[in-house]
Amino acid sequence: MRTVLTNSNIIAQRFGPILGRMLFAALFIPAGVHKIIDFSTVSGYMTSKGLPMVDVLLVLTIIIELGGGLMLLLGWHARLAALTIALFLIPVTVIFHPYWNIEDAQQMMTQQHMFMKNMAIIGGLLCMTGLGSGKFSLKAAKFS
């Protein structure tokens, strides 16, 4: 049994970081692409939330989601990308999922779920910030 646990730990340490980076990339890269494709609709939604300079904020959002997602996928400055996305998600979560202001019970539950999901994503990104990109990354690659 001890051998199985040791082997599981080795596999998790070797492949966990790249699988985690791939899953984060699968979330943020399509989100950034969607915002490019549907720029005006997303801009209108951001305007409805009372945000100023929505086009500038939307371009920054695209850069963070798409650029950060690609950086995570490749393992290129993954700690910086993870920290940037985590810090970006804090105000995004508070602004776009304020479940405490919603009276309709169903909408409140939905927004609370979205809020907590984002908090979990922030937690995972902070773990990645601390642990780094792992073995299979551009950082770990040896180019000679």
Regions found by a protein language model. Give the residues of each.
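Extended, low-polarity transmembrane helix blocks
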Residues: 1-37, 47, 54-63, 67, ...
